[in-house]
Amino acid sequence: FENFRKRSEKEKSQMFDMGAKTIVEKILPVIDNFERGLAAVPDDKKDDPFITGMDKVYKQMLTELDAAGVKPIECVGQEFDPDFHNAVMQVENDELESGTVAQELQKGYMYKDSVVRHSMVAVVQE
């Protein structure tokens, strides 16, 4: 009976994580839009109360995602890893070694130990 209870708890936890991962996948485009929108604000408008409010909402969303176990994948300067990165282009770069991620085109995220979205990257060509 004890084994059945443990197995049931593990299955319930896995089902919860699958549901949470699905929700995170749906929230990531919203985060992307916040980042694009805030990046497009001219420097002379960054102190506008509406813009500072939107920035605070964006940062609060990131804080809550982090607390829930969602973390961005660090990639620039790292060796390309197909488990975490999706290479969408190759670039020349004299400062980085071949096979190194030179640029992040879209941020990737992990939920706990699994990739929710791979980072879309530019890799230094050989």
Region locations from a protein language model:
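Structured alpha/beta interaction-core segments
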Residues: 33-126
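Charge-rich, N-proximal long alpha-helical rod segments
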Residues: 2-35
